[in-house]
Amino acid sequence: LLVGCGDKEATVAAPTDSAGSEPAAVAEASRPMAEVSQARLDNAAEQPEQWLTYGGSYDETRHSSLTKVNRDTLSELGIGWVYDMKKPRGVEATPIVVDGVMYVTGSWSVVYALDARTGEEIWVYDPEVSGEDAAKGCCDVVNRGLAVYEGKVFVGVFDGRLEALDAKTGAVVWSNVTVDQSKPYTITGAPRVIKDKVIIGNGGAELGVRGYVTAYNTDTGDLVWRFYTVPNPNKEPDGAISDEIFAKLANETWGDTGAWTTDGGGGTVWDAIVYDHVNDQVLLGVGNGSPWNAAIRD
């Protein structure tokens, strides 16, 4: 992990020996961490010195209004510090930064909390994804990010778990298996937090699954609702909030036979989840059908 700053020589951040040990900048036992309220998320764009949520704000524009880095100062940038994640696989996550602490995921769904100023390690959490589960993925054991809210860090684990971690120590607060682990489901996308709910999707449509997103209570981990993106293969209710819309509009547009009825139909929401806070709606980007080959899907 490389972090840039103005015209300075790089420092190499030394990992600590155990989860939970804190460098001086964050050593105060009473110091709150990841104190991100709903109000802060609603107004994330007004705090450009922070990066509170995936995409920077609910709009997910990924735009920063900070002005110190511009055409005139670009040549002055250098490497501020370097941190070795010790996992030689792909890294696709954008870090979350809250009040001087950086939270970021690496490959194998490992979560790191670092001092954003120095790169010193605060804690590391490894969910210990197995090689057997890794074989289910289409595109490496990457992870695209996490969410923070009211003292917790939320991560979607490659093997289908959604976990809440204590932002101060990295300890697991709660853990839920969100998928049928006998099927080739994976999670590589970042969770989104909206009004005391953490929302997570999944991947795996390339190999034959049925897509859905699920909302869990951020405090307890209890399931709040689930929305499927393709109909039930038997056109039956799932006991999910998607039942009504399928009965009214979708079931009749899907055939009663075809490989989709046995291979799930696909439509996984493997990353794109956006909250429209003006209309209080969640918008989903839906992935490919399953089987991928449309000639045998229908």
Predicted regions and their residues:
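Beta-propeller domains
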Residues: 66-79, 106-128, 298
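A structural motif specific to WD40 beta-propellers
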Residues: 80, 120-124, 171-175, 224-225
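Short coil/turn linkers that define WD40 beta-propeller blade boundaries
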Residues: 74-77, 119, 170, 221, ...
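Bacterial signal peptide processing site
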Residues: 5-8
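Extracytoplasmic beta-rich repeat domains
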Residues: 83-94, 124-147, 175-190, 207, ...
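Blade/loop signatures of beta-propeller domains
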Residues: 20-79, 234-247, 298
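Short loop/turn segments that connect beta-strands within beta-propeller blades
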Residues: 115-118, 128, 166-169, 217-220
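Repeat-blade elements of multi-bladed beta-propeller folds
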Residues: 51-55, 90-110, 136-162, 186-206, ...
